[in-house]
A protein has these predicted regions:
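C-terminal, non-catalytic interaction/recognition modules in large multi-subunit enzymes and RNPs
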Residues: 1-271
């Protein structure tokens, strides 16, 4: 026979073959202090859990998206940041170019709205090329993450919309106004209430409204998945926020980068 144990249990076999199962106090087992996060093993555990949260959101986005641009071309990203917009994890299937642009977009959202004007039910949106990825088809959405009433980070996603109005696949536009609909930094969802006026404007200005709206809803769903998983991590390990993890990730990343640069032979490099 097979005995299946929960993750918070331990088992021993006594001399006569009986199974002694003990339920472990998960609060004592999982609690990480600030110093422990710097431990390589603990950092690896937490960091991989955050990456897994982004990966799960990306898988959901792919399954739920309407357009082939996202579903087959993988022209999207899912990112988790700390409360200052510093990147903690990006989904493994996200395209590399967004790894630098999306955290910057989150920082622009923070500067535009300020943290005190954000609520747990908010979702922010923009496709401003100067605050986003450089062109209008990439729509970025961002959700503030709260734990115990405190802003602890952001989940964010960028996806290339199948259409955003304007001229189709043409190098002719000389101004951004010819490229399509511009969405300034707005609250697409304000404290749980969808901005239907904005959605109507968006639908009326694109050629494939169902696909554009469907992809956008898939992005919003992905934000919610990242929100839930991050709060699960914080509760499981009794962390108040992501600040200590963020510091540890940045320190480890800086160290690895410096080591790689140090390994480069001296010389003149051109690109």
């Amino acid at each position: 026979s097979t005995t299946v144990l929960q993750h918070n249990t331990s088992v021993e076999v006594d001399p006569v073959g009986n199974l002694i199962i003990e339920i472990v106090d998960t609060e004592k087992q999982n609690k990480f202090t600030s110093n422990q996060i710097d431990n390589p093993i603990h950092l690896e555990i937490l960091w991989n859990k955050v990456i897994a949260a982004a990966d799960e959101a990306a898988a959901s986005l792919l399954r739920s998206s309407f357009s082939t641009v996202v579903r087959e071309s993988y022209d999207f990203s899912c990112v988790i940041t700390d409360s200052n917009g510093n990147s903690l994890a990006q989904a493994s299937d996200s395209i590399p170019s967004f790894i630098g642009t999306l955290p910057d977009t989150v920082k622009h959202f923070i500067n535009h709205f300020s943290s005190e004007n954000l609520s747990p039910g908010d979702v922010l949106i923009t496709n401003d090329p100067y605050f986003g990825t450089g062109h209008l088809p990439d729509i970025s959405v961002c959700k503030p993450l709260f734990n115990g009433g405190k802003l602890i980070g952001f989940s964010a996603s960028t996806a290339h919309a199948p259409d955003i109005g304007g001229k189709i696949r043409s190098p002719e536009p000389r101004e951004v106004y010819e490229e399509g609909l511009q969405i300034p930094m707005l609250k697409l969802i304000n404290n749980g209430t969808v901005n239907e006026t904005l959605m109507t404007i968006l639908r009326k200005n694109v050629r494939v409204a169902d696909q554009v709206e469907g992809d956008l809803e898939a992005q919003i769903s992905a934000l919610g998945i990242m929100e839930k998983r991050i709060n699960d991590i914080l509760n499981d390990y009794q962390l108040r926020d992501l600040s200590e993890l963020s510091k540890a990730v940045c320190r480890r990343t800086e160290l690895a980068t410096r080591q790689e640069i140090n390994n480069l032979p001296d010389g003149t490099y051109k690109a």
